[in-house]
Regions:
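Non-transmembrane, aqueous-exposed alpha-helical and coiled segments at domain scale
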Residues: 1-280
């Protein structure tokens, strides 16, 4: 059994919150540059040039990529041979988010009640997900999630008879309905299977996966390529002004489901798809 003091998580989460909001992952930058090279229209190229310039300034000056620094989603993959000591895990995670958003001068966007509102003032609580995995390590991933794109996300409980065409049409419907609202070019996370809640989580986790990776099953890997091509043929384009680049990536995550169902969730993210990880 390996003991880990929760204060280590606090320090790492503080750092990851700041790093994620200041610096886009390399796979996202590469995808944006690749799409820029493929664009024909001057408006679309100009917008992508502005996006590239924006993240280069953020890198150089250590400032947020976007004013919406999101709600902090924290994913912990906890080795089953780990024992946390030194305090409450939930409190340690929130303290890391609190410090990150205060010390990193990141916008505080969380309200304490969904209806009555009232800003918490420090961007807590985090949305915390935990998975138990083999081993004695902990992988920490922080993914700040802006809500211009989150509000465009949808879930649908398909019957098995709808088949793969039902899922394809739904993905296109979600993206087309979103239009310019999620600040395209977007990244599309798709979750298929599980239950109502699990499909949504799969879609969220799909957004954390690097854009230069594929689903391990060839059927879904091919579907990722096919749907990205179809989305980009919609012509929504960068910031909704038209062009070839409506999305820079589409990732699918799947799991088994009930014989009577085929849940599908689509989680939309803007081009500022932010996530950083560290293993202890």
């Amino acid at each position: 059994m390996r003991e880990i003091n929760v204060s280590q998580l606090t320090d790492i989460i503080e750092k990851l919150c700041i790093d994620a909001c200041y610096h886009l992952p390399c796979d996202v930058k590469d995808a944006i540059k690749t799409c820029r090279a493929c664009e024909d229209g001057e408006v679309a190229k100009g917008i992508l040039d502005n996006i590239i310039e924006n993240y280069e300034i953020a890198d150089a000056d250590n400032v947020p990529i976007c004013q919406d620094t999101g709600m902090a989603c924290v994913f912990l993959e906890i080795g089953q041979d780990v024992h946390f000591v030194g305090g409450d895990l939930r409190e340690a995670v929130d303290e890391g988010v609190r410090r990150g958003y205060v010390n990193g001068y990141l916008r505080k966007s969380v309200v304490r009640d969904p209806v009555l509102r009232g800003n918490t003032g420090d961007n807590t609580p985090a949305v915390l997900y935990t998975d138990i995995v083999p081993g004695d390590q902990v992988k920490i991933t922080v993914g700040p999630k802006g809500f211009g794109s989150e509000n465009m996300s949808m879930i649908r409980m398909f019957k098995p008879s709808h088949g793969i065409e039902g899922i394809k049409n739904f993905i296109l419907e979600v993206v087309e309905t979103a239009g310019p609202n999620p600040c395209p070019p977007m990244v599309v996370g798709v979750g298929i299977g599980g239950t109502f809640d699990k499909a949504a989580l799969l879609a969220k986790k799909a957004l954390m996966r690097p854009l230069n990776t594929s689903h391990p099953d060839k059927f879904y890997a091919d579907l990722e390529v096919e749907m990205l091509e179809k989305i980009n043929k919609l012509g929504i384009g960068p910031q909704g002004f038209g062009g070839k680049t409506t999305a820079i990536g589409l990732n699918i995550e799947t799991m088994p489901t009930h014989i009577a169902g085929m849940p599908c969730a689509v989680n939309i993210n803007c081009h500022a798809t932010r996530h950083k990880s560290e293993v202890i």
